[in-house]
Amino acid sequence: MVKMGIGYDIHPLKKGSHLVVGGTKISGEFSSDGHSDGDALIHAIIDAILGAANLGDIGQFFPSDEKKWKGMDSTHFLSTTIKKVLSVGYKLEHVDTVVILQKPEIRQFVSKIQHKLAHVLQTNKENISIKATTADHLGFIGTSEGWGALAIASLSKLE
């Protein structure tokens, strides 16, 4: 049986030197403002995976009010999540994502992001889809006040 989960995350942007997207540092004028490293893409993927396995959400496992997660690399959260899901008998089949960010342009980093996520998720790069779009200068994303990501994950139950 294949199970599906959906995830969504947004973070404010602040002046900075780089943005972390899918565990990949992208140089630019903005950084994500979050309790951890503010990687909205990974946070959305985590919620999608946990949802598909009916295990809750990112806040239950990594609460943003716990000091130990302050500044944490979100790949740690993702690695812990996939290990948990594997331990209860699921296999990751596919992750499909959309990153919504006005700037910087991330299309040239998609392959690198896929490779990083595939490594952390213990799967093939072909099982990770990353799409990038802008908000066409509309709303808080369009004015570069924030960014967001959507993710859908499919898991199969191992027999």
Regions found by a protein language model. Name each.
Residues D65, I130-T134:
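Pyridoxal 5′-phosphate
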Residues N124-N127:
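Short acidic capping loops at alpha-helix termini that bridge into adjacent secondary structure
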Residues L117:
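Glycine-rich, mobile lid/loop segments that gate access to catalytic sites or pores
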